[in-house]
Structures are given as structure tokens and as C-alpha cells.
């Protein structure tokens, strides 16, 4: 397998757009799968994504667009998946081309709903992609700041760290610093959990809890994350590293965080449906909450923050009541 070969971006949202910008800082050209032909036409005409990160300009002559997933896969060696996890299976149903000989990078910060599996496991289980040919791209990195070329740090995790290093070099730039890891499962689970905890932080903000309590919440969240990771995927990891703690902090505190925004709306009294409609963007943590809750039924890890968010979102228990109970459990 020649790496990276031809790279394809699989998705058309803000994070996909930011990753395309990162790739084109190093690559001569890329392939790009978007499901909507009208978006592709507008992109070519305007020179930017018409719906997301509209300030990022592209030389469209360096991009081969297509709404046909099979054509893109056939013409590519490395596939970077950036579709929201709730829609991944729908996209993949259109795929007739085998991908087991491709290199897969998942930048999806979610779990496949209903299956309750992390994305790397999904590609191995459903499509026969060997684990050593799957990498995870994660870290405290908002798409909006990549667009502004603000210094950001990303981690590429793969069981084969030599392959991870190849992509770390190709994705790095003057504004993107990269590191490598082999903790694929741990990083994927932490990427899901930090969205859940960002919703919790948003709910508390909507309820007018202050910065002092937010600090306590996040401190307890990283402990809860560590307990879960050590139970589900035991490994000698340091959760203080930026790909774990850093990603949790930026997602929990930043105004760019859609999960925090979603939680804030819930804390202010919005229903789940009304918050989702008004946001017009996917808050992955909503789906991740239910998935982790189901997974934890097999492990019985003490996760009071996850339980509180689940009760608020899915059991429709008052945020005020749930968060008050949560405050009594913190130290």
C-alpha cells in the first residue's frame, strides 16, 4: 500500500472543509465527496463551501468533486471520513466499491448509532478493513480556528505508528502541529465523551452556574472519562495529554462548540427537538450519550455526569433537578 496516495475527503461540513484546507497545504490535489450536486455546483462557482466556513477560499482546479461515492472511492487511496456519525450508515449504503484495501482515516467524533460501536470498529466489522489500515484524527481543534489558521494541535492514532507518522507529516503545516499515538479506541471514546461533557457544561451554563462550578464539572468529567477508558480499553495512557484533556477543555468551554451550544439551549428550557431545529447543525453528543449509556450497561462504570445528561435528554427529567443532584455528588 502506497501512502498516502490520492486523498479523498468524505463529507461536506465545516470539519470536512477545514481538513480539506489542511490537506491542500501539502497535496497538489484531492478528491472530495459531497452528497449534494447543488452544493458542488455552488462550490465551483463561488470558490468556497457555500454552507460552511464560507471565508475559506479554495483553488477548485485542485479539487475533483463528485456526489457519487463509488467514483470517489475508486479514484482514491486514502479516505478521510468526516460525515456526522448518525448519517454514516446511510452514506455507506450507497457504496458498492470495496474499501478493505483502502487506508481509512476517521475524523468522526461520534459512535455509530444503534450499532453502538466506534467508527474504526464499524469499518473493520462491516467492511473488512484491517485495524492497521485505520487511523483516527482527533484533538482540540475547532474547524473555525483552522479556517483562520490559528495554531492547532492534532493527533493521528493508528495501531501501526509508522503509518500514523506518514499522515502526521502530510497533515502538518505552519498552523497545524501533529503527534502520533496507537490508542485508537481510547481516543475515539474520549472524542465521544467530551461531547457529552460539553453538553453538560452547556446545560450548567444555561442554568446560570458560574465558572467556579464549570471548573469542578470538567475536573470530574476527566476523572469519569479516565474510569471509562481504563475499563473499556485498558492501556497505559495519560489522559492529561491534549488529545484527551485538551479536546475536553476546548469542547466544554469554547463558543465554537456546537455541543456546548446545544446544552446551553437545553439548560435554558428548550426541548431537544426545538434545540436541534434551531441549531441546524449536528450535536454529536446527543447521540453519543445514548450510545455510551448502552455500552456502559456491560461495564457498570460509575458515570454520574453521563447519567445526568442521559436523564435530561432521553428521560426528560428537569435539568435543574438533575444538575442539583449532580452537584451533591461532586467534591
Residue ranges, per PLM feature:
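Internal alpha-helical scaffold of NAD(P)-dependent oxidoreductase catalytic cores
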Residues: 87, 98, 126-133, 151-238
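NAD(P)-dependent Rossmann-like dehydrogenase/reductase catalytic/cofactor-binding core
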Residues: 194, 201-205, 230-331
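A short helix-to-beta-strand connector/capping loop
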Residues: 56-65, 129-133, 174-176, 301
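NAD(P)+-binding Rossmann beta1-loop-alpha1 motif at the extreme N-terminus of oxidoreductases
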Residues: 1-56, 63-67
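Rossmann-like NAD(P)(H) cofactor-binding subdomain of soluble oxidoreductases
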Residues: 66-74, 78-151, 167-169
Amino acid at each position: 500500500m502506497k501512502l498516502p496516495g490520492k486523498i479523498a475527503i468524505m463529507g461536506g461540513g465545516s470539519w470536512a472543509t477545514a481538513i480539506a484546507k489542511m490537506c491542500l497545504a501539502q497535496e497538489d490535489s484531492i478528491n472530495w465527496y459531497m452528497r449534494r450536486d447543488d452544493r458542488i455546483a455552488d462550490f465551483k462557482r463561488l470558490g468556497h463551501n457555500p454552507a460552511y466556513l464560507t471565508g475559506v477560499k479554495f483553488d477548485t482546479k485542485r479539487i475533483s468533486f463528485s456526489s457519487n461515492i463509488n467514483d470517489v472511492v475508486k479514484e482514491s487511496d486514502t479516505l478521510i471520513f468526516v460525515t456526522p456519525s448518525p448519517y454514516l450508515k446511510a452514506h455507506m449504503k450507497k457504496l458498492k466499491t470495496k474499501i478493505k484495501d483502502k487506508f481509512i482515516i476517521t475524523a468522526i467524533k461520534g459512535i455509530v448509532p444503534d450499532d453502538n460501536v466506534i467508527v474504526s470498529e464499524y469499518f473493520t466489522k462491516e467492511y473488512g478493513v484491517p485495524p492497521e489500515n485505520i487511523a483516527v484524527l482527533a484533538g482540540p481543534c475547532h474547524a473555525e480556528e483552522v479556517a483562520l489558521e490559528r495554531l492547532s494541535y492534532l493527533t493521528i492514532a493508528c495501531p501501526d505508528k509508522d503509518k500514523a507518522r506518514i499522515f502526521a507529516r502530510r497533515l502538518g503545516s505552519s498552523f497545524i502541529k501533529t503527534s502520533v499515538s496507537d490508542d485508537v479506541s481510547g481516543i475515539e471514546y474520549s472524542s465521544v465523551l467530551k461531547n457529552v461533557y460539553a453538553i453538560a457544561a452547556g446545560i450548567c451554563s444555561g442554568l446560570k452556574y458560574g465558572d467556579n462550578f464549570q471548573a469542578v464539572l470538567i475536573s470530574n468529567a476527566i476523572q469519569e472519562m479516565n474510569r471509562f477508558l481504563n475499563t473499556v480499553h485498558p492501556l497505559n495512557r495519560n489522559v492529561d495529554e491534549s488529545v484527551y484533556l485538551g479536546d475536553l477543555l476546548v469542547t466544554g468551554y469554547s463558543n465554537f462548540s456546537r455541543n456546548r451550544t446545544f446544552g446551553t439551549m437545553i439548560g435554558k428550557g428548550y426541548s431537544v427537538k426545538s434545540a436541534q431545529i434551531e441549531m441546524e447543525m449536528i450535536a454529536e453528543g446527543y447521540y453519543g450519550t445514548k450510545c455510551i449509556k448502552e455500552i456502559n450497561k456491560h461495564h457498570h462504570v460509575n458515570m454520574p455526569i453521563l447519567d445526568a445528561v442521559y436523564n435530561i435528554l432521553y428521560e426528560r427529567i428537569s435539568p435543574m433537578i438533575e444538575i442539583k443532584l449532580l452537584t451533591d455528588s461532586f467534591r
